[in-house]
């Protein structure tokens, strides 16, 4: 039977070339190592004496916390928070545009009973009633929108950090209110924002609005420890306008030189453009189910001007630490569901590998010092329509994150033609508004960026910044140091697999049913599976080895290992013998599972839940107790074989992933049955269950305990023709008891006879199974 291919893979009995094993170990070590990026990134040293170098700061990157500044009066820039850090009580801030905004912030000490105090506000002496019953400091925001009315207490802020904030943005003036550590922002509207001027009576800081989350953090939890020492001296605000000697956009500085080598410092302003890649996979069936919505690495090539020079750059964007979610609208075939959709949020990272054609990247092999500064960028998600056949389409929309520079190290990008020594910039994430939701479902109000439409129609996102590094390079500028081997998050294998998946799914729809049955009956092994693939005769053994090594990490192989882990003799026979059937019968690997399910049934009373849990294990039980009938894995292997023979994208690198993926994703909607005399018990992975008689197809009560006992002691059969199809066939055409038994046992000869007779019910069932064989 064709499923022999999967059983052979599960034996893990294969030979390996020593050179292949060494290559694999080296690759796995590179891929699994955790890089802690710091101010230095080093590779192999070269024969020179290293000397110190300088790293020029860049004016293209705004500091998060700028200050402290001395008390002053000025016209505040839009989109910048003014963080007030008063020491003494009294008036700490005044601001007005002389038309519709007059705002003053007063600081009241702790434990003050209600009393009247005099304050001078905008040249007027005002008597204001204040009180503070708290052990924290209290800011009174006094506001009026007309020069002829009195000030009113608008938004008090009770604070143990003694920090307040003020911002002009979007036709509004913003302040903080509430009580720390849960203070929030609020605003007053103005029609004349550009004319707002402020008088500040205390030390203050300036924070860009793009870092509002940091400002919120300072207000609620206090300034960083370094800002609370007496070594930090406030300076005049005019110091912001001092003209600095700005470093050049491109700088090549010789630090030292010998006869053959020289140390070079390269300083570069860079523009990084990147985009997210994604993969949306739809399950087979009626068109209401999606398998995954996931992030994929994406590369982007572009040109930009840098100091009058045309630069060609290449970036690769990948993500790490994704969060997996799922949505299931119900168990019916017409209920919308997404088995897995990915989301990036605060615990995730984004990696961007950057390369350009400048001299800095020509000899990036021996690197001593590496530093960088980059601005932040906000990435907002767009809409994605799940196009179901009938009814209003569910729409995944919204979601946003901001990327903040968190480190830089060395990497290598693999393009279609060449490997590029690159810089990898790591970004931490903060979630932003809006939240995302799936319209017409109960999913709403979640934060993060989903993989459905992460680019939101934009060709790319853009970040400006600067890097500086010191390299050891040949004294002869025309010589290029050979590139050293390296492994990155993104490899071209993903692109090849994407092309292969599309081709595979297209070819699988062209399979003739009689061809499928014939292939399903063949005893396909490793080498007959590869026989139709061109140019693989010389590498058949290596390819088989690669497939087996990949397959042993698959979900199916892991499940078998878990079942046999506590049974040494059974595990030994599974991993070493040529056939999984041998010696399994003496110690049933199903025993532990049935006991676990029996225990679960005591706490979970839903028969549907129990049968669903049992059915997901029945595939493993079927593998260990083969029958003469055709099973789902026979169909999977047959569908796998046909497109492989016709594929133009198959290669030794992609084949292991395709075979492993097929074992996990093909025919997700499976049903299994056990047969006892004239009674059949059948259950599927969605929790549907039937018990019926062979002669009449009359349903009888379903007993879970009996089903478990039968599945433990009797062979498990794939319900290729499930109960509903059998009943439909009997009601419309009438079938004999012998035919019914053959179909229940999934006899391939009887299936072929019905297909040759063009029986529409049987053909439709087989077509639905083929449609579920998608990557």
Curated annotation (Swiss-Prot):
The keyword Disulfide bond applies. Gene3D superfamilies: 1.20.5.170, 2.60.120.200. Disulfide bonds join 317-379. GO terms for biological process: permeabilization of host organelle membrane involved in viral entry into host cell; virion attachment to host cell. Pfam families: Rota_VP4_MID (PF17477), VP4_haemagglut (PF00426), VP4_helical (PF17478). Residues 509-775 are annotated as: Spike foot. GO terms for cellular component: host cell endoplasmic reticulum-Golgi intermediate compartment; host cell plasma membrane; host cell rough endoplasmic reticulum; host cytoskeleton; membrane; viral outer capsid. Residues 247-478 are annotated as: Spike body and stalk (antigen domain). Residues 388-408 are annotated as: Hydrophobic. Residues 65-223 are annotated as: Spike head. A motif (DGE motif) lies at residues 307-309. The keyword Membrane applies. A motif (YGL motif) lies at residues 447-449. The record marks 230-231, 240-241, 246-247 as: Cleavage. InterPro entries: ConA-like_dom_sf (IPR013320), Rota_A_VP4 (IPR042546), Rota_VP4_MID (IPR035330), Rota_VP4_MID_sf (IPR038017), VP4_concanavalin-like (IPR000416), VP4_helical (IPR035329). Keywords: Capsid protein, Coiled coil, Disulfide bond, Hemagglutinin, Host cell membrane, Host cytoplasm, Host cytoskeleton, Host endoplasmic reticulum, Host membrane, Host-virus interaction, Membrane, Outer capsid protein, Viral attachment to host cell, Viral penetration into host cytoplasm, Viral penetration via permeabilization of host membrane, Virion, Virus entry into host cell. Residues 483-515 form a coiled coil. Signal peptide: none annotated. Belongs to the rotavirus VP4 family. This strain probably does not use sialic acid to attach to the host cell. In group A rotaviruses, VP4 defines the P serotype. This is Outer capsid protein VP4. The lineage of its organism: Viruses, Riboviria, Orthornavirae, Duplornaviricota, Resentoviricetes.
